Amino acid sequence: MVGSNFGIIYHNSAGGASSHGQSSGGGGGGDRDRTTPSSHLSDFMSQLEDYTPLIPDAVTSHYLNMGGFQSDDKRIVRLISLAAQKYMSDIIDDALQHSKARTHMQTTNTPGGSKAKDRKFTLTMEDLQPALADYGINVRKVDYSQ
């Protein structure tokens, strides 16, 4: 997403009205203060108070404290938890796609390969390595011989 504004809509402060594809509802401009990026952020941050991320706040706070970051605002901790959850989800999804591609190649090369729709996948290093490499993380299997 290099070069994009990540969905943030900027309005001209001089009263011009380029909405970049977003309608303001009534068109009268009465809802103008609700469409500013700061109001979107404050709405999102207030919604984080009710949201429970998959990574508990205590775990996120622990690792933030280990890194030297301290915050008493649980919304900040939950925002970081949500970002970590999204990052991990993207990596796991990429690993799943690598696994599907690998198993598809194995079943097409094998005559009479199974084509079950409800197949279970196991996360292996073989699939995780290329997914992490896409994100610039290099991992290797541990050599068990000494």
From Swiss-Prot:
It comes from the Eukaryota. It holds the Pfam family TAF10. TFIID is a multimeric protein complex that plays a central role in mediating promoter responses to various activators and repressors. The gene is Taf10b. Residues 16-43 are annotated as: Disordered. At embryonic stage 9, expression is seen in the mesodermal layer and midgut primordia. The mesoderm-specific expression persists in later stages of development and at its highest level is detected in midgut, hindgut, and differentiating somatic muscle fibers. Coexpressed with Taf10 in the lateral epidermis and anal plate. Belongs to the TAF10 family. This is Transcription initiation factor TFIID subunit 10b. Belongs to the TFIID complex which is composed of TATA binding protein (Tbp) and a number of TBP-associated factors (TAFs). The N-terminus interacts with the histone fold of Taf8. One of its GO terms (molecular function) is promoter-specific chromatin binding. Keywords: Cytoplasm, Nucleus, Transcription, Transcription regulation. Coiled coil: none annotated. InterPro entries: TAF10 (IPR003923). One of its GO terms (biological process) is transcription initiation at RNA polymerase II promoter. It is found in: Cytoplasm; Nucleus.
